[in-house]
Amino acid sequence: MAGPVKDREAFQRLNFLYQAAHCVLAQDPENQALARFYCYTERTIAKRLVLRRDPSVKRTLCRGCSSLLVPGLTCTQRQRRCRGQRWTVQTCLTCQRSQRFLNDPGHLLWGDRPEAQLGSQADSKPLQPLPNTAHSISDRLPEEKMQTQGSSNQ
């Protein structure tokens, strides 16, 4: 289990604003302006406090107008094929900005990979310091000093 989270209150506030935007759209789909305001506020708080948001949250917010992207309500989702790869294209219905996401079932986001987790990093063995190969003259043994001085006199 991870230790105490820095800026816990800020993350709770971001979570509340994100959930409030979802609730507003679920209750009244016509009230997109209030949901957009909640998402914009969440985005500005995260920027001001330099907090990293989860990629799944970032994918559901429009980067242009800060609208909550709900397929069929505030955005359209299309499956496209380009150069043999399949892409999901989300287009915001408010500002017409589109985002493309690669459809790769084997793709894992960095945060979902095992090496990104703090617990697995703590379990790995600690790094050993490298031996210092560059010795100064003062680090040499007295016999070595005598040998070098004797060879220089010859």
Curated annotation (Swiss-Prot):
Positions of region (Disordered): 117-154
Cell location: Nucleus, Nucleolus
Cystine bridges: none
GO CC terms in record: multimeric ribonuclease P complex; nucleolar ribonuclease P complex; nucleoplasm
Residues annotated as binding Zn(2+): 62, 65, 92, 95
N-acetylalanine PTM sites in chain numbering: 2
Amino acid composition bias (Basic and acidic residues), ranges on this chain: 137-146
Recorded GO MF terms: metal ion binding; ribonuclease P activity; ribonuclease P RNA binding
GO biological processes: response to xenobiotic stimulus; tRNA 5'-leader removal; tRNA processing
Keyword annotations from UniProtKB, A to Z: Acetylation, Metal-binding, Nucleus, RNA-binding, tRNA processing, Zinc
Membrane in keyword set: no
Family: Belongs to the eukaryotic/archaeal RNase P protein component 4 family.
Record's subunit section: RNase P consists of a catalytic RNA moiety and about 10 protein subunits; POP1, POP4, POP5, POP7, RPP14, RPP21, RPP25, RPP30, RPP38 and RPP40. Within the RNase P complex, POP1, POP7 and RPP25 form the 'finger' subcomplex, POP5, RPP14, RPP40 and homodimeric RPP30 form the 'palm' subcomplex, and RPP21, POP4 and RPP38 form the 'wrist' subcomplex. All subunits of the RNase P complex interact with the catalytic RNA.
Annotated function: Component of ribonuclease P, a ribonucleoprotein complex that generates mature tRNA molecules by cleaving their 5'-ends.
Annotated protein name in UniProt: Ribonuclease P protein subunit p21
The organism of origin for this protein: Homo sapiens
Gene assigned in the entry: RPP21
